[in-house]
């Protein structure tokens, strides 16, 4: 496709950093990670499958006769919790191997999967530093009218083990992005929307769970330095690398879906201009929600 894409193959048994730096590898994350050298990444961001366990039944909104659209992609389908847990365990085991001793990892999820992932991380020896709650200002309503609207996602931030002390934490950015004067672990920002959302040839969203630029900006600025190397083994539409490049960090991404990579390549042709300040309108939203008073 393009020079930024490396196609994995069974014949390839090892990747040097020079081969994959600032590139996306087209391949299976579990296979590709085994071919990467140990202890080279300063930070890892993972947006794994949610395992929503949606039924094939078309659910109708309670107040209008239209169908609810959710995440129903093949990559989100597993046969059981055991299969899902095994996949996550293997992924996190390989990721831990390629993290620097001082590296940190972020994993994002919803109530469907984040608690299982947190337990697996602790079982593997990771030491959780924080959870960060992303409050969505434009969440999908609970159209079925049977439960609360799910307006949050949780990010787990961790190091390789409890003895790690020299990880990067940029406190001023944390205070700037978190709510209240102390910069609490709550980030208020919208879902990916408008021109930021990548579309397919039919004008439909290319990826059902594309993460917003603002979210990755906050992750990267609070936990890395310029020149650091960032890994995203489930890159989707490439937001992690896209933001990393704009913030003068290096990256390696892995993605198995060729359509996502095609969209990613087109995206990278348009350089991202980004500021390290919170988006002003988001600050207004925080005040509207009554969150600015947190001490």
Task: Mark where each language-model region is.
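Intrinsically disordered, low-complexity segments enriched in proline/serine/threonine
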Residues: 50-51, 192, 273, 280-282
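C-terminal helical cap(s) of enzyme catalytic domains, especially alpha/beta-barrels
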Residues: 261, 265-276
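Asp-based, Mg2+/Mn2+-dependent phosphohydrolase catalytic module
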Residues: 253-254, 273-278, 285
């Amino acid at each position: 496709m393009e020079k930024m894409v490396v196609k994995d193959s069974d014949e390839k048994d090892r990747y040097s950093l020079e081969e994959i730096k600032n590139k996306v590898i087209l391949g299976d994350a579990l296979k590709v990670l085994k071919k990467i050298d140990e202890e080279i990444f300063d930070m890892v961001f993972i947006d794994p499958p949610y395992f929503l366990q949606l039924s094939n039944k078309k659910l109708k909104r309670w107040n209008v006769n239209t169908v609810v659209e959710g995440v129903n992609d093949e990559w989100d389908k597993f046969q059981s919790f055991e299969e899902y847990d095994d996949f996550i365990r293997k992924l996190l085991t390989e990721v831990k191997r390629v993290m620097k001793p001082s590296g940190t990892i972020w994993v994002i999820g919803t109530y469907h999967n984040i608690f299982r992932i947190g337990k697996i991380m602790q079982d593997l020896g990771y030491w959780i530093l924080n959870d960060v709650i992303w409050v969505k200002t434009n969440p999908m309503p609970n159209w079925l009218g049977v439960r609360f609207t799910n307006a949050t996602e949780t990010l787990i931030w961790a190091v390789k083990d409890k003895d790690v002390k020299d990880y990067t934490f940029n406190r001023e950015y944390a205070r700037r992005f978190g709510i209240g004067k102390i910069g609490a672990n709550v980030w208020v920002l919208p879902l990916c929307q408008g021109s930021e959302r990548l579309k397919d040839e039919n004008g439909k969203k290319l990826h059902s769970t594309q993460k917003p630029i603002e979210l990755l900006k906050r992750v990267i600025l609070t936990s890395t330095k310029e020149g650091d190397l960032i890994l995203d083994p489930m890159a989707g539409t490439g937001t992690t690398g896209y933001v990393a490049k704009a913030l003068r960090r290096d990256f390696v991404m892995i993605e198995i879906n060729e359509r996502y990579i095609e969209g990613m390549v087109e995206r990278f042709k348009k350089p991202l201009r980004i500021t390290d300040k919170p988006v002003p309108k988001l600050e207004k939203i925080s005040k509207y929600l009554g969150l600015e008073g947190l001490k």
